[in-house]
Amino acid sequence: MAKIIAFDEEARRGLERGLNALADAVKVTLGPKGRNVVLEKKWGAPTITNDGVSIAKEIELEDPYEKIGAELVKEVAKKTDDVAGDGTTTATVLAQALVREGLRNVAAGANPLGLKRGIEKAVEAVTVRLLETAKEIDTKEQIAATAGISAGDPSIGELIAEAMDKVGKEGVITVEESNTFGLQLELTEGMRFDKGYISAYFATDPERQEAVLEDAYILLVSSKISTVKDLLPLLEKVIQSGKPLVIIAEDVEGEALSTLVVNKIRGTFKSVAVKAPGFGDRRKAQLADIAILTGGEVISEEVGLSLETAGLELLGQARKVVITKDETTIVEGAGDPEAIAGRVAQIRAEIENSDSDYDREKLQERLAKLAGGVAVIKAGAATEVELKERKHRIEDAVRNAKAAVEEGIVAGGGVALLQSAPALDDLKLEGDEATGANIVRVALEAPLKQIAFNAGLEPGVVAEKVRNLPAGHGLNASTNEYGDLLEAGINDPVKVTRSALQNAASIAALFLTTEAVVADKPEKAGAPVGDPTGGMGGMDF
């Protein structure tokens, strides 16, 4: 495909137009009085949202240079969302302010590389100041306030705080759509995976259609079990111990399954067979997780273990195992706490090194099952459009609350950024580097000014007033009053604020140092293909 190339000011201005188009659509959502944006979908109902990254992802511009500019800012929003789960609109507003000020200085003759170094040093100084002023979050009320602000609904904040209180900061909180109106919280004790018993005959409670085994042995096998002779030596040992047995394998079929079922019905021996969760390598990893949690071993030819020679020492144990037709829950596995902690650390390292959102999500679920628990928030609403929007808000708020617990909180409403500007006074910079630091100083005011503008106030007046207030005091845009924001429960996780600034500065530096842009040449729309037969003139259909 043919390419088109733009140089110097033309290249940078083309990128800036794309950035501005995207940022202008996103920034209307900032603050408690921000508005929503309606996104058309090819299929189904349109989506109404105030989430920066969701809006950014939908924007596709026609002009090739503008398109590249918009894509660069999408990267800011996406990276901030990946790292902190919120702050995407703030990051976009900061990027726009940094680029606008930076390009003005480049046009006036400043050296882009000098500006880049100045911006980087200034951002580092502000980040250090933010982390120094961050306040640790330790109460349920503070978590509720943080999550409530992110979701724009205090009741959602309270529910998330309750969920985090129950499952711990390592636990997973998932959000599901509900058919009933309102919000519900469901908690899962122990490790749960979405595979149930292979045969309904295994149920110990026919009314509830579930099998409950107390103080059970757990046999983990990576392959299929079909012949009973493989299983018999081990079954005899388990029967002698007097404990029930849960078999988790790729599959249990044929005479092996019928033997287990017959013994269960006769009351000779209580057991349940369950298919292992997942597929391929993911199945192996999940079986290994269960083995570590229960203190057992996965019987696999890969590690030289076979069913015929297996003894009780290779079986895992748990205080209780509850199995329904769809899922299995293992409560209080007998695994070594040190081994579990080691496995948790290993999974956490895999999460950090993973590039795929899907893989990261699956690893996060495995981490939660080992380290904490699982809480499910079920959200319902009157219409499908409202339900989607509400679910998205809750998911953002959950990640926001986790970020707050991780690194602490600072005053919200754009105040923490503006009041971190004095950190730049200590930098001894000269020339273009000093100009770069000043670009950051101007940009630090942008989020607060946008919040004030969306609330119908004069941005410049608000920024000047907040600059002269004590640390942590600022504008409460929902009431248009000034006061102590942390006390009023208006806070942001420092991880969100820090990530927004760092990611915005990273993209801004790329914009300023760009000297040429190479883009695909737009194809001209061809004339519609005519009817080769010439049609059938005079015919009236």
Curated annotation (Swiss-Prot):
Give GO cellular component annotations, separated by semicolons. cytoplasm
Q: Where in or outside the cell? A: Cytoplasm
Sequence positions that bind ATP: 29-32, 86-90, 413, 492
According to the UniProt entry, its GO molecular function terms are:
ATP binding; ATP-dependent protein folding chaperone; isomerase activity; unfolded protein binding
Q: Which GO terms describe its biological process?
A: protein refolding
Matching entries from CDD domains are given as: GroEL
Kindly report, in one word, the top-level EC class recorded for this enzyme: isomerase
Pfam families with a match to the protein in the record = Cpn60_TCP1
State the InterPro entries in the record.
Chaperonin_Cpn60_CS, Cpn60/GroEL, Cpn60/GroEL/TCP-1, GroEL-like_apical_dom_sf, GROEL-like_equatorial_sf, TCP-1-like_intermed_sf
Q: What's its job?
A: Together with its co-chaperonin GroES, plays an essential role in assisting protein folding. The GroEL-GroES system forms a nano-cage that allows encapsulation of the non-native substrate proteins and provides a physical environment optimized to promote and accelerate protein folding.
Task: Report the sequence similarity comment from the record.
Answer: Belongs to the chaperonin (HSP60) family.
Q: How does it assemble?
A: Forms a cylinder of 14 subunits composed of two heptameric rings stacked back-to-back. Interacts with the co-chaperonin GroES.
Q: Which HAMAP family match?
A: CH60
Stated name of the protein: Chaperonin GroEL 1
